């Protein structure tokens, strides 16, 4: 059995640190991609009293949130109109990505005789989603004047927040400042938000009315310097498994597909029942590390869909079947932390955690 153990205390402490850091700004907690792999229902249930909004990528994720919490939920992604009636009935906040969305939403709202809560996404430079910057003001004005829309928010997204010195950060902030000025001229109550986790840590004056700290809430810090208070934020989860078999190699034998790992006579290998079929990175095969009884052991051979092997050497520490194996550590400096694994596989912590799938049990402790 593979378990992602999540510390409720660490999670809540992370959010409290963030809330203190952002001052009076509201907090919108992104729980998209199954709460970055941590389990959307468990995370929402244990944080709903600490945050103002939740945010997700699509309608189906939003319904999972509204099933367990009453907080407002913002959907970042495009509007899937096959789900729009349920979204409106549950007061889920939609993101207007184009001027044309307004008329479509108005028509449906009229038919349902119920207003739609909306946030307008403005493309200030990431060039992925959102209303074109040059069309921003007329779109905001149109939505604000609509009888069937409640324009609750206007937002954008930083493209280079992980690099605090990137000039695009200033360019996007300046553009958003002009949007905020126009928006507040219509109503001071419209929530303006731009910053993700690394945005408000790396840039000044960027919190506006609300921030959206996703990866930071789960305990992952940027690589640039942050102050002492933020350094108290810790990863919330550890991925654990068990040793299910010990194998002793004979002279000339190997292990795994293609037998790329060749051991020595008498070498012992531990079999762990987790693989890339669980969303664990296949690239770690033959070069990753696991922790068994506070000793680091190297992976041996290719990772399979459902299992991997580690070399115990001569097994001087007497690893046994049933011993706990730590695959992902909550200590960033460890060789098997999400940070270290991401570096080793040329990716980011988001990727390592969010790809862990539902074959892995989530457990709040």
Curated annotation (Swiss-Prot):
Annotated active site: 32, 257
One Pfam family linked to the record: Ala_racemase_C
Gene name of the encoded protein: alr
Disulfide bonds: none
Protein name as catalogued: Alanine racemase
SUPFAM superfamilies reported for this sequence: Alanine racemase C-terminal domain-like (SSF50621), PLP-binding barrel (SSF51419)
GO CC term, one of those recorded: cytosol
Modified residues (N6-(pyridoxal phosphate)lysine): 32
Broad EC category: isomerase
Cofactor(s) the protein needs: pyridoxal 5'-phosphate
Keywords, sorted A to Z: Isomerase, Pyridoxal phosphate
Catalytic reactions of this protein: L-alanine = D-alanine
Role description: Catalyzes the interconversion of L-alanine and D-alanine. May also act on other amino acids.
GO molecular function: alanine racemase activity; pyridoxal phosphate binding
Domain of life: Bacteria
Family of the protein in this entry: Belongs to the alanine racemase family.
Entry keyword annotation includes Isomerase: yes
Binding site for substrate: 128, 305
Pathway(s) annotated for this protein in UniProt: Amino-acid biosynthesis; D-alanine biosynthesis; D-alanine from L-alanine: step 1/1
UniProt record, GO biological process: D-alanine biosynthetic process
EC number(s) on file: 5.1.1.1
NCBIfam families hit by this protein: alr (TIGR00492)
